[in-house]
């Protein structure tokens, strides 16, 4: 799954970078065209050029840097290997080999596409310390847990 790991990292990092560039266009002194950036970056190394060219083709179909674009990129190449990508990251960390880019990209991907958002985690921590009620997602029933007895 090494190729999928590299592609996953490349796609997530590229997507985040392109979004930063796109957002910078709100200021008058920046006026970047995403297609021009793809063209300039594709002149890099062969591997990078191949990845950028395939992502650039997909961008031409979408014409939008939205989450659907990122999801389609990763699903196409990595969906069947996602468990292995996570295991690779976990094994690296357990072995004392930091994988900061992969860890960060997995967290970014999960933040966007997971059913469990960071806000839920924060609320759970608030509930733990403040004993607030929580709502069960399955039946909308409110529960007032006493966390220290769980």
Model-derived segments and spans:
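C-terminal substrate-binding/catalytic lobe of Rossmann-fold NAD(P)-dependent dehydrogenases
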Residues: 1-95, 99
């Amino acid at each position: 799954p090494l190729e999928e790991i590299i592609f996953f990292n490349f796609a997530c990092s590229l997507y985040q970078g392109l979004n930063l560039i796109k957002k910078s266009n709100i200021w008058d002194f920046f006026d970047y065209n995403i297609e021009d950036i793809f063209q300039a970056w594709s002149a890099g190394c062969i591997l990078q050029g191949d990845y950028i060219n395939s992502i650039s083709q997909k961008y031409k179909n979408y014409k939008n840097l939205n989450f659907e674009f990122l999801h389609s990129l990763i699903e196409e190449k990595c969906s069947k290997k996602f468990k292995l990508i996570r295991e690779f990251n976990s094994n690296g960390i357990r072995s004392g080999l930091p994988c900061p880019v992969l860890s960060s990209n997995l967290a970014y991907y999960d933040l966007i596409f997971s059913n469990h958002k960071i806000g839920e985690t924060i609320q759970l921590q608030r509930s733990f310390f403040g004993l607030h009620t929580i709502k069960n997602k399955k039946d909308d029933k409110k529960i007032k847990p006493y966390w220290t007895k769980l």
